[in-house]
Structure formats: structure tokens, C-alpha cells
Curated annotation (Swiss-Prot):
Keywords: Hydrolase, Metal-binding, Protease, Thiol protease, Ubl conjugation pathway, Zinc
Protein name: Ubiquitin carboxyl-terminal hydrolase 12
Source organism per UniProt: Salmo salar
UniProt key word Zinc: yes
Gene: usp12
USP domain segment(s): 39-371
Amino acid sequence: MEILMTVSKFASFCTMGANASALEKEIGSEQFPVNEHYFGLVNFGNTCYCNSVLQALYFCRPFREKILAYRSQPRRKENLLTCLADLFHSIANQKRKVGVIPPKKFITRLRKENELFDNYMQQDAHEFLNYLLNTIADLLQEERKQDKTNGRLANGSLDSQNHNSNAPPPSTWVHEIFQGTLTNETRCLTCETISSKDEDFLDLSVDVEQNTSITHCLRGFSNTETLCSEYKYYCEECRSKQEAHKRMRVKKLPMILALHLKRFKYMEQLQRYTKLSYRVVFPLELRLFNTSGDATNPERLYDLVAVVVHCGSGPNRGHYIAIVKSHDFWLLFDDDIVEKIDAQAIEEFYGLTSEISKNSESGYILFYQSRD
């Protein structure tokens, strides 16, 4: 049995090596970007949801640069952030240009820290992205808090560490990169008073419709909703419940806009989630038109830099891959396999025009990076 396992592993790595060699030849030594590395990630049992998100984040340059800068700081005790920093550092400092890396330490830590991922079942890539970004932000905030406490202890001002303890946690570079702000506007139809409430986000989840575009979906996200009957709005000016119009607008656009397409819908008659393989076009360039009147950067223009693609018919079955833009060309990362693809091939991941077949390769999470 051990001999068979060894032969199998050897054959697998030979295949990886051949794939890497082919990729290097296809890109060409003269065209290969300086200080760039393209490494597939080994699948440790249905960890494609993790691999695809990590590849997408690696090619979000502002995020990669912050992670690598964190790695150069004095070492701290192991956590999910240090494991991610070690993985990115390992990729960025390989002697070879292409190849395969096993993200074993990161996966082990992930499974240790969150029981949701502590199994060999397929998980949701969006849930993982959300967990990862929030965990990194929490760790950075905790480290900053510890550093300030240690500094106060060194200065002999222990009593001040609880000063302003009710203040919101400080912003981190995760927020600087991914955080945007929505404003929820409600207009009373009786007195015309408008009230608004801001809400921060690290990614936007949008409903999908058949044969549409991501621009259409984003406009739908901001459609005006009428609050009436039992859903009337309590107006502070009128001091009573009134009919009102409610809509969501984008007040602050993030540096990197992560868009989650809500492709999994719970079907009551089936008692389970099913996939909406609708064809939703996502352009290489994007500008949002559903910004608020007081938006800080309404004209911000975005370029598509990465897409996490779901292949299959449901959330707990199928496979995840990532397509990323690196310099002037596109790459497809399928766990340990890395291939160069044409920009036109991205159209294959829009979804299906027919609802008969639910099995498709569909864009699931889009990463747009601002030009400014």
C-alpha cells in the first residue's frame, strides 16, 4: 500500500512539474513579469473553496503587499494571519517562477480555529472569505490594543488603558482596502423628511437575475422599496407610522470592491439550497451608478482583477477555481493546476442562458480594484 501511495504521489508531482513547465513556456521568459510567481495550491480534501479565495486575494496587490509587510515585522505567536503571511511569503520568494505549494500549515490552523472548516466537506467560498477578512481585522485590532497596553505599562500609566473603552475599534488595513459604506435612506411620504443610517461592509452580496449584468444587479440592490400596510415606517417628525420609501445607496466606495453573487437559493419545496446558474455578465471595467448624493468618490473606476468561480450544481457539491489578472494576461488556478487563458475565455464563467441545466461554471465572487 505504501509503495502504491508513493508511486501515486510521484506521478502527481510529475504532472504538476509538466504543467508548470508548460506554463512557463507559454508565457515566455521575456514576457514573464519580474518578481512574479505563479504557484498552484495542493488540495487537502475539498479545500478548493480555500485555495480559490487565497489565489484571488494574492492577486489583489494591495492586500498581498500588506500581508508581506506584516510578515517582515517581529514574529508573534502563530495564528491564522501569521500562517497566511508565511504562505504568501513562501510563494513570493520561490526560486522557481512556477510550481506547486502545499498550504498545509494554513489549512491546519484554519481547521483548528473554526469548527465549520474542520472537516473534509465542501464549504462555501464566500463564507470563508468573510471569515478570513474579519479574523485578520480582529487580530490586527487585538495586536494594536496589546501594543498600546504594553506601551502604557512601560510608561507606568496603567490606569489609562481603560480610558475611552467604549470607543469603536480602530480601523485596520483590511478596512482601508475592502471597507465601503452603505447609507440606508428612508423618506416619509407624509412630511418628506429623509432619515439615513450608515452601514459598513467588506463585501457586497447582490441578488442575481437571468440574462443580466453585474451593473443591473447592483442597480437592483438600490431599488426603491415602499414601506406600507403592516410594514409602515415610524417617522420621528410625524410621531406616528407612515408610508415611506426606502433605498440603499453606496456612500463610500472601497479600494477593492468584492462582489458576492447570491447564486444559492433555498427552495422550500426541495428543503435544500439549489444553484442559480443564471448568466450574469461581469465587465472588465466597472463604475457604480448607485452612489449617494454625498458619496466621497462617486466617479471611482474599477478593473476586474480576480474571480472565484463555482463549478457544479449546489453549495455543498462541486468545485471552486479562481481566474486572476496578472499584469497584462489572465491565469486560471484550479488547485495545483495553473493555466494561462485568453481574456475572451472569461465569458465562459458568466453562467447559463438556459435554466434546464443547473450544472455550470459561474462567477461567484468578483474582485474589482480601483484605478486611483
